[in-house]
Amino acid sequence: SASLFTTAPNASGTTWSFMDRNLGALTVERGSFDSHGLLYQWGRKDPFPGTTAFTIMNEDYTYEVDGEPEVYDIDNRVLPKFGLTAEFHGTIEKSVQNPAVFYAMTYKHTGVEDEYGEEIVENDYKTGDWVDVSNDDYWGGESRKKTIYDPCPVGYKVPVCDADGNTPYAWLVYTAGKWDEANRGFEQEGQWFPTTGTRAYASGGLDYTEANPYSGLWIGTKGKASDNLELYPDLYGQYMFIIDSKRMLKVSKDKRSQGMSLRCVKE
């Protein structure tokens, strides 16, 4: 069973008690793909399988599916790979009816070039979200309360920033921990963070390269958007970025249709 790690109080007196593993992980064993857990789209309850081997990202927004574990239906039949069954134009209703469908961001090739000779590519959900109606509180980022879309088990919830905007991952600092090159992960305060890769927002395919392993841990708080949403309509979710090649851990933001890891905290 999972144990808890409680952070030291920040300047606002806030603490978070984290599970010792990613949501869906079967173990905290270093180097085991069973420690990776599941991947989630921001604000969505439904999980997607992580990797069981390294995959390679292609340049044309399509992804290799090698390394994706086999998933079976109730009749013990192997289901198609998730990257091959991803759909566009997601809604809450569709996600409830089809929890195993990854709703990717739609790209449309216009065939028209811009002033620099590059093709103009449009997307239908210009926010970069997987769902047609975006909501900053799908995971309690505004209310700081557990919601019906929260995938964490009873007594736990998705971590969000506190009332003063402080991140729950401020305690994670590259120079305060140790990068484990052999097992491809980061350890600090006895807590193990494997690099899990992601499911790409454009396809639902896995992106996990052996040459540059990385991980993203979702935070239920929205990422900063542009002040001019009419011109730059992208909406984001915050996440903790863990990558060795840049020698850093930092809170960043990504499109909400991206599939990333998640680590629950005590309510």
Sequence positions of predicted segments:
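C-terminal, surface-exposed recognition/capping segments
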Residues: 23-25, 99, 107-267
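Short, compositionally biased
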Residues: 1-146, 223, 256-267
